[in-house]
Structures are given as C-alpha cells and as structure tokens.
Amino acid sequence: MEDIGVTVKEKLTSKKDRFTQLTSLLKNEGFEVELICEDDFTSITFNTSNPDPIEISIQLFNDYFRVCYWDGYGVAEFYDYKNFSKAFKKFTKFLTKSKS
C-alpha cells in the first residue's frame, strides 16, 4: 500500500507547473496571489486586506487528495478524490469561485 502513496505523491509534485500556470493567469487578471508548493501540500492564497484571506489547497492524505476551500470569513469546504485530475478540476472551480 505504501507504494501507492509514493506514486500519488510523485504525481502531486510533478504537477507544480500546472499550479504555476494558474498563478500566472490570476496575476495577469490583476489578482495578488501567493503559491506554495510542497511535497504533500499545494495552495494558492489571494492576498487582500482581509487578515484571513481566501485560500484554495490540495493536500495529500495517504492515497487520496483533499481539495480545501477557505473563503476568509468562515465558510470552509473540502472534498476528497483518489484521482488527481478530478481534484485539480475542483481546485480550478474553487479558483473561479474566489475570483467573484
């Protein structure tokens, strides 16, 4: 079973370019964002005057990906996926939600 986790972890770190591209697109649209990429955690935070800004993240837990959304005011959502593509799709939907 540990081999599955390692494979998934490698997939997450190998997708850094996709998150970097999203960050660049957001910056081109005028948003101030910060990207954090680690082995088992990737997040994009919207830098605003709110002391607790919007954050969207993908975290690695054993053999699944947890996509989290924090709106900066008290609404938190998270979804778990075994497939990175589905998790990334949810991640981008949360980014779209954050832009409005």
Language-model region placement:
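Intrinsically disordered, low-complexity regulatory segments enriched in Ser/Thr/Pro
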Residues: 52-90
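Alpha-helix boundary/interfacial micro-motifs
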Residues: 46-47, 79-80, 88, 99-100
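Residue-level detector of alpha-helical secondary structure
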Residues: 23, 27, 85-88, 92, ...
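Negatively charged, low-complexity tracts enriched in Asp/Glu with abundant Ser/Thr
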Residues: 1-50, 73
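Charged, low-complexity, helix-prone segments enriched in Lys/Glu/Asp/Gln
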Residues: 11-15, 65, 94
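Short intrinsically disordered terminal tails
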Residues: 1, 96-100
